[in-house]
Amino acid sequence: MHQSKENEKWLVTNPKGNHALAVGLDNFINVKIDGSTGYYCAGMNKKASIQVNGSVGPGVAENMMSGKLIVEGNASQYAGATGHGGILVIKGNASSRCGISMKGINIIVKGNIGHMSAFMAQSGKLIVCGDVGDSLGDSIYEAQIFVKGSVRSLGSDCIEKEVSTKHKHQLEQLLDESKINLKASKFKRYGSARKLYNFDIDNLSKY
């Protein structure tokens, strides 16, 4: 795959849960994986469009730079971690720590996500159409979180924020690109209260 010409198409069959499939791609190619994968599928992706017709193990799209990844099933923990760009669409549920330390990636989850998601998330958008576990957005920076369902609890320095017309437009664009037919008006927005950016001894118990 790494020597592929632009717009080439690849089909991977019977992946059998193997690890590190379609990792480090750096060209405008299309990859379809028919089946479920193990750890780190599509990690460090750049430019490529990838579709997984199954579920994925931990670390899918870790440190993704650009391109698009669609997961038709569920994703294990820390999906999209440290991602700098591109779009990750998970049609099922995502486990804990989804989008931790994200740095520009857009993550759309049609189902639910687990605890500690968007921990130290710096930029980008995390969109959840279902429910969210404990400690959402703990120590978050400037990433934006949109949730349609319930949130069990918010992490340190994460608060609910107003959804402006601009935010609704951005949300509608990403939902449309993900082929998810939901109204932006049904979502709540969460982000940083910006109180823990600099260490203050009076806030010690909040860290």
Language-model regions, residue ranges each:
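Beta-strand repeat architectures
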Residues: 1-9, 19-29, 39-48, 59-66, ...
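N-terminal hydrophobic or amphipathic segments with adjacent small-residue motifs
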Residues: 29-32, 48-51, 118, 131, ...
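Feature marks extracellular polysaccharide-active and adherence modules
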Residues: 13-15, 34-36, 43-44, 53-55, ...
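Glycine- and acidic-residue-rich phosphate-binding/metal-coordinating active-site segment common to enzymes
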Residues: 96, 102-104, 108-111, 115
